[in-house]
Amino acid sequence: MFVPRQVKAVANVNIELLDLMYFQNSYNVPYRLKKGGDIEIKPILVKDYPLYEWSMSVLNIKKNEINDIEIIQMSYLDFLVNKLFVQDENELHKLLNIIRLCLGYESVSFDKDKGKICLLLCNKEGIIEKVINSKEFDDIAKIILFQNDFNYDDRYINPDVEAIMQEYSKVKYGDINNPTLEQRKAFVSSKIGKTFSELNEIPYREFDLVYHSALNGEIYIAQKIIQGSYKYDVKEDIKHPLFEKKKDPYSEVFDDPSVLQNKGIQGASQLNTLNFNESQKE
């Protein structure tokens, strides 16, 4: 029987390797702590996704873009505990939700180890079982975000480019309705014959991939029907979305700046002078 090896706390989490070994198979990701042994990072189930979706923002705040040298110099965990949670208790509840759903612990606390903030995972009796330092917290947060979203992307984007991209998405897709999770479950249920109760127990990442696969199949068939109709002149052959080259969401705005220019969006004219690759931090 294949037993995936444990992930050690190293300088950089190898997401590509984790994807091959764990994410694609909906396995828990084992992570070895310096203190407290091992923990398992569990994928989010469909039934828990709404709460996870509300809570996940606490893991990817762009701390280093805040104009405060003290905050920039802090670890992410230190920033959460000593800045964010003091200002907004809801942010603390978000982290507690993430820890319960992904790590399986209901009781947590914070303390210092060698002057640095640590996250303590406790059992029901309040006894400390795991100690997560700031570097390990960063690793675990990164694993959680990639584990539960097939399309998650943590590349650095120049703030000016990102602002233009947000306007681009708002203008181009503003009139498109995003189906609710309930509607997506109904669609998937109609395709694979599983009840809502059965779908609720599927890892969300798996469910989301099935949803988009089924949706793309319908779009492909509809487009092929249009292509075969004498009423429409479709010059290019239509490929199934599964075989199309994956589009870079960050590059799309550079390929089609006219969307923003036609709307008179400020900054659209700058797209020709901005180089996306050079805008990224090494």
Predicted features by range, described:
Residues M1-S75, S134-Q227, E282:
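An amphipathic, hydrophobic-aromatic interaction surface with interspersed Lys/Arg
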Residues F79-N148:
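Long, mid-chain structured domain cores
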Residues N277-K281:
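Accessory, solvent-exposed terminal regions and/or long lumenal/extracellular loops of proteins
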Residues E201-A268:
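Accessory, usually C-terminal, subdomains that scaffold auxiliary metal cofactors
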Residues D38-I39, E106, I117, Y230, ...:
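Compositionally biased, intrinsically disordered low-complexity regions
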Residues R32-L33, R100, L260-K263:
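Compositionally biased, low-complexity repeat tracts
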Residues E70-Q73, F85-L92, E129-F137, N200, ...:
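Intrinsic-disorder-associated interaction segments
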